[in-house]
Each structure stands twice: as structure tokens, then as C-alpha cells.
Amino acid sequence: MASPSGKGARALEAPGCGPRPLARDLVDSVDDAEGLYVAVERCPLCNTTRRRLTCAKCVQSGDFVYFDGRDRERFIDKKERLSRLKSKQEEFQKEVLKAMEGKWITDQLRWKIMSCKMRIEQLKQTICKGNEEMEKNSEGLLKTKEKNQKLYSRAQRHQEKKEKIQRHNRKLGDLVEKKTIDLRSHYERLANLRRSHILELTSVIFPIEEVKTGVRDPADVSSESDSAMTSSTVSKLAEARRTTYLSGRWVCDDHNGDTSISITGPWISLPNNGDYSAYYSWVEEKKTTQGPDMEQSNPAYTISAALCYATQLVNILSHILDVNLPKKLCNSEFCGENLSKQKFTRAVKKLNANILYLCFSQHVNLDQLQPLHTLRNLMYLVSPSSEHLGRSGPFEVRADLEESMEFVDPGVAGESDESGDERVSDEETDLGTDWENLPSPRFCDIPSQSVEVSQSQSTQASPPIASSSAGGMISSAAASVTSWFKAYTGHR
């Protein structure tokens, strides 16, 4: 037997025994032991590096005890006792588990009962809340039913009202259709009445006719009288007299110098091409020559009278047709003898603008209109062949014709328009100053002021003398050629 302490062998002091025989037995056992005897080898029992005093067989078999006498029980006996204790422990554990199994089941049942009670309470609360919500929903349902009933009755009333309104609308539609037919018939009767009044006015008081002059071209007359002018200059002047500025371009006018348009009689007429150079020449001569003008067939008087009558006719037509003119022009505008070239040109532009405006309102064929032909446009307006004469309603204004109307006399724009005496206020030029200018295409606007029609017609016509009319036409043609020649040489 060996001790696990690993120290030197000590004699066991037991009663009746000496240390010698024990030491001898140990030496014998050591000599008989097998294995390595190394000082550093660890003990397999205590895991120390003390000196080994047991044999390997005893250690393997467990046949060893403590040498110090603490416990005489062998290791193998301890091991057997440990195994027995473990088996008893397992038996005790099984018995304990078996004894506690009933309590565990009881606890499980108690937990289940508790959870069921909690769930029952929750279900009761949920049922109470559900009942409350059902009561609220039932009350809301009753209110909704009452509301739906009211809405249904209201819808029935609205349906009845709708049917009543539809019947009323059908009656109104029939009435409107009938009134529309009546209005159209009234418009037709009004147009016929206006047409008859206008035709009576233009046939009795203001007859407008086309008069053949039967005179030679003033350029040819001037070329025969003035040998200094070259043939090229004469041809250029003749070509210039046969062209007219229309819609932004120069067009050829075959009837430029062959015809004239008369108003109130053949002795009061205007040039067909809108050339008022005879009046300009008379104004210049009036400035240089003092004293009364004794010539009764002066073309300036004829032009002034024709323009004055045209102004009166335009104002009367605007009253009959119920059309507000865009430009304010008095009946006596052309009656004065002191009209300068600028004032005269401005007044002619106003008259042409008003005539074009009336032509637009009566849907005159735009291909026939030329902005500078005053009486010819007026003749087309009051012509018996005009289909829409006397009409009422909206109309469209042609912007290109209005722009072409601005080009009356190119020499006027560069002259003394800036002087204080020649300036014209807005009230004298435009009636629609308070209205907004709209971009093209422009439709008719109702001006803010009305044109006074009932003004005194104080202009007297010249005596109907055929010879004086012919002489006036010749003088006008000669003066026209002279003005063209002056303008031509001045520009050169």
C-alpha cells in the first residue's frame, strides 16, 4: 500500500507494532513494483510531483489508502460506495419526482384555471363593450334610417321639382325659340326699314354716282405744255397716278384718273383715287395770294363740299344703323377756309376710318374696299345691291385695311405736325379712349361716347353749272400734276 502524500516513508505508530517490519514491507513492495521511478512523475491520484510510493497495479486496481491513517478505506471501496450512493440518489430523485408529480399537475391545473378565469373576464369585458357598441350602432342605424327616409322624401320632392323645372325649361325653350324667331323677323323688318330709309336718303338727298370725266391724263397735258420735262418723268408720273396704296402694297388702279364719284349732284365730286392735291395747291396759293377768290369753279371748293356732304351722310348713317363711329368728326369740319394741309389730311383720315367702320358693320365685300377711296367706299356701303345693308350685330374689323388707311400723304408725316397749333387732343381724334385696345383680329367695340348727328347742315352746294364743273376738273388735274412734279423735283 502506498500513501498519496509522496513524502518519505514514516513508521506508523500503532499499539503493539514497531516501525521496522513496516519499512521492510514497503521496501519489498517497492522492489516488486513495476513502472518508471522518475521524481517528476505526477501521482495519478493527487496529481502532484511527489515521490511515488505505490505500484501501478495497486493504483489501477484501487487498492491503496492514506498512509497517514486518516482513512483506512480503500479507494476501490470508496468508489463502490460512491456508485451505491449515486444509485440511491437516483432512486430518491425518482421518488421525489413521483411524489411531486401530483403537485405539479395540481399547479398546472391551477394555472389553467386562473388563465381561464382571466380569459373569461376579458371575454365578459369584450361582450360588454360589444353590447355597448351594438346599442350605439343600433341608435345610429335608427338615426340613419330616419335620415334616409327624410332624404328619400326630399329626393322625391326634388324629382318633382326637377320635372317641374324641365317642363318650365321646355316652355321657356319654346318661348325663347318663338322670341328668337320674332327677334329675327324684327331684325329683318328693322333692316328693311333701315335699308329703305338709307336708299331714300341716298336717292333724294345724297345721291352718289360714278361720273366719267372724259378728260385726258394730266400727265399727258402737262407733258405737252412743259417741254422741259423728259418722257421718262412723264411716264413715271402717269404710272404713279395709276397706282394706289392698298393693304400695305401698291396696286394698279385702271380707273384712277378716268372717273370721279359725285355726291348730291354731278357738280360736287371727289377724285376716284383719293388725290386731294388740288386742295393742297389751293391752300398754298391762298397763303401767298391775298384777297378774295373770285373763281367759282375752284376744285378746292368742290372737294370741301363733297367731303362735307360725305361727313353729314356718314353721321346720319351711323344714327340710322345704330353704329357708334370710332372717330369724332363734325359736319362742318370741311366748311372752313383756313384748314391747313395737316388738319385737312387728318380730317380725311377720320372720315375714311368712319366709312370703313360702317362698311365693316354692314359686311361689305372687303375686296371692293380701298382705304383712300372715300366716296367709292361710301357708294359700296349704300348700294342697293348690298345684301347686308341695315343689319345689326357684331362684326370684325380688318386690321390691314386700317393700317393701309394711315398712309394718306407721305409728305404730311414729315412736316410740321409737332407745332402747337396743329396738335389735336385725344377728344378730337378718338371717341373710344376709355376702351382697351385688343390685338388683331379686332372685333367692334362700343365707344364710350356717341356721335352727334343732329348738327346744322350749313354747307351750300355750288350752282349746277356744267362748264364750271368741267373747268374745275381740268384745274384739279393740272394742279395734281404740278404737285406731283414739285414733289418729284424736291425729292431729287
Curated annotation (Swiss-Prot):
Annotated spans, Cysteine repeats: 43-58
Coiled coil regions in record: 71-180
PTM summary: Ubiquitinated via 'Lys-6', 'Lys-11' and 'Lys-63'-linked polyubiquitin chains on multiple lysines by MARCHF7, leading to ATG14 aggregation and loss of interaction with STX17.
Low complexity compositional bias, start-end: 448-473
Top-rank taxon, per record: Eukaryota
Matches recorded under InterPro entries: UV_resistance/autophagy_Atg14
Membrane topology summary: Peripheral membrane protein
Record's keyword annotation contains Endoplasmic reticulum: yes
Biased composition (Acidic residues): 415-433
UniProt cross-references to Pfam families, sorted A to Z: ATG14
Effect noted on mutating C46A: In Atg14L4C4A; fails to localize to the endoplasmic reticulum
GO annotations of cellular component type: autophagosome; autophagosome membrane; axoneme; cytosol; endoplasmic reticulum membrane; extrinsic component of omegasome membrane; extrinsic component of phagophore assembly site membrane; mitochondria-associated endoplasmic reticulum membrane contact site
PANTHER family assigned to the protein according to its UniProt record, in alphabetical order: BECLIN 1-ASSOCIATED AUTOPHAGY-RELATED KEY REGULATOR (PTHR13664:SF0)
Annotated function: Required for both basal and inducible autophagy. Determines the localization of the autophagy-specific PI3-kinase complex PI3KC3-C1. Plays a role in autophagosome formation and MAP1LC3/LC3 conjugation to phosphatidylethanolamine. Promotes BECN1 translocation from the trans-Golgi network to autophagosomes. Enhances PIK3C3 activity in a BECN1-dependent manner. Essential for the autophagy-dependent phosphorylation of BECN1. Stimulates the phosphorylation of BECN1, but suppresses the phosphorylation PIK3C3 by AMPK.
UniProt subunit comment: Forms homooligomers; homo-oligomerization is essential for the roles in membrane tethering and enhancement of SNARE-mediated fusion. Component of the PI3K (PI3KC3/PI3K-III/class III phosphatidylinositol 3-kinase) complex I (PI3KC3-C1) in which the core composed of the catalytic subunit PIK3C3, the regulatory subunit PIK3R4 and BECN1 is associated with ATG14. PI3KC3-C1 displays a V-shaped architecture with PIK3R4 serving as a bridge between PIK3C3 and the ATG14:BECN1 subcomplex. PI3KC3-C1 can associate with further regulatory subunits. Interacts with PIK3CB.
Name by which UniProt lists this protein: Beclin 1-associated autophagy-related key regulator
Source organism: Homo sapiens (Human)
